[in-house]
Regions:
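Extracytoplasmic/lumenal domain signature
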Residues: 1-133
């Protein structure tokens, strides 16, 4: 699976099946985030893959800048279905354009599964998103 985004070129995050590149086409698109989600901006950070506490695999990414709602947030998307399982928005309390830019995954209890994500937003805040529960 190849995960990517449009960066500053648009509001899109996608997953592609690249197991057989000799016959690559439309059927290789596993899913694409809808550009109509008001919390999805121009996501320029990496789309990360995580094994979560529930033993499922997810794509995790920062929402990026210029979303309609102008807040920083984290998306957790089921890797195989493309369904948004969790969307956690940070309450920055400001009246300014913001967005989560880059993230780092953490296994804080050493069990091989991600239970926290750290991310920096456009205005310099560092956020911790607890995914353990």
């Amino acid at each position: 699976v190849l995960l990517g985004n449009m960066g500053r070129g648009g509001r899109s995050v996608f997953a592609l099946d690249v197991s057989n590149t000799a016959s690559f086409g439309e059927t290789n698109v596993l899913w694409e985030m809808p550009t109509t989600d008001p919390d999805l901006g121009q996501a320029a950070g990496r789309v990360e893959v995580m094994l979560a506490e529930d033993n499922n695999w997810y794509a995790v990414f920062a929402n990026g800048v210029n979303s309609d709602n102008q807040n920083a947030g984290l998306f957790v998307v089921n890797l195989s279905s493309g369904i948004v399982e969790r969307k956690i928005m940070a309450d920055d309390g400001g009246d300014f354009a913001n967005g989560l830019m880059r993230i780092a995954l953490a296994d804080t209890d050493g069990n091989g599964k991600v239970d926290a994500v750290y991310g920096g937003d456009y205005v310099g805040n560092l956020w911790k998103f607890n995914l353990s529960g």
